[in-house]
């Protein structure tokens, strides 16, 4: 009697990360490993650790939060990018293509997690991408490899036997800003709400952090709220990185000048097409292109 055999099928992995705050010791090994692996310049980071001191002496504790791209299923940065430089791979990783990025910062403004930055060396957008180049060849991300307490886990959510799937299904985990509807794929275990919510902890007096000072706060968004605003006097940021507002006058100037450039070229073209000026007019053949090129530059 003939028998049939089930043909094995391969399922595309769905990569996700679990950050165990009950194990994190705030050592910054993940930050330095990420910088080394991805050649991230000074002054910018793909991942960083934030410290928040909670409570009053003698009952005080320090909470840590590892911050990075949340690999959203419905990624606002992908929707905002005008050149498709930000894109979501079939395996769930939100990746970027530096070769077509124009540095417009639309992705930075769209991201609700403060996870994207402009690389000062090539003026293109970067962020954590789970070390996709390592996952593609069967290696773990650099941060996962170096974490001394194994607080970072990356795995396939489509595999019920993966450590990430088991932790998500077994333990109480949360995501950042679920109200945004982005369906992030970075899950936090044992996280203190004062670290996940940028409005829950006040800045230290004078902007003086553990190891650094953040400059003129009038040009920064230190933790997502005005410098003196605070809804929890018992929660104080003790270490954070500068968070500059993604868009300033340069974006408005960029939009304004490029609009003039487009108009200077299109208006003479429309006038020529409608017969209001001859095709040989200097407004179309000379003045329009010159003005367009000046404002385009």
Indicate where each model-derived feature is located.
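Non-ligating segments of multi-cofactor redox enzymes
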Residues: 1-247
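Hydrophobic cores of alpha-helical transmembrane segments in multi-pass integral membrane proteins
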Residues: 217-297
């Amino acid at each position: 009697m003939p028998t049939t055999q089930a043909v094995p099928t391969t399922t595309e992995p769905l990569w996700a990360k679990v950050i165990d705050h009950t194990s994190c010791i705030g050592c910054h090994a993940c930050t330095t490993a990420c910088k080394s692996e991805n050649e991230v310049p000074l002054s910018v980071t793909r991942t960083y650790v934030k410290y928040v001191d909670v409570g009053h002496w003698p009952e005080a504790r320090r909470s840590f939060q590892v911050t990075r791209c949340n690999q959203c299923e419905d990624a606002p940065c992908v929707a905002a990018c005008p050149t498709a430089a930000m894109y979501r791979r079939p395996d769930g990783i939100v990746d970027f293509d530096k070769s077509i990025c124009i540095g417009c910062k639309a992705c930075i403004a769209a991201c609700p997690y403060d996870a994207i930055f402009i690389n000062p060396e090539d003026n293109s957008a970067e962020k954590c991408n789970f070390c996709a180049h390592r996952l593609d060849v069967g290696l773990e991300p650099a941060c996962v490899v170096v974490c001394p307490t194994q607080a970072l886990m990356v795995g396939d959510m489509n595999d019920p036997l993966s450590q990430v799937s088991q932790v998500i299904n077994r333990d109480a985990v949360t995501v950042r800003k679920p109200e945004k509807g982005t369906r992030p794929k970075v899950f936090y275990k044992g996280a203190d709400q004062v670290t996940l919510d940028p409005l829950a902890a006040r800045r230290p007096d004078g902007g003086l952090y553990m190891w650094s000072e953040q400059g003129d706060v009038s040009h920064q968004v230190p933790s997502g709220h005005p410098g003196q605003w605070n809804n929890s006097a018992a929660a104080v940021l003790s270490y954070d990185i500068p968070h500059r507002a993604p868009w300033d006058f340069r974006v408005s100037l960029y939009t304004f000048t490029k609009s003039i450039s487009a108009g200077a070229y299109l208006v003479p073209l429309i006038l020529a097409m409608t017969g209001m000026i001859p095709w040989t007019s200097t407004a179309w053949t000379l003045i329009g292109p010159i003005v367009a090129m000046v404002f385009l530059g």
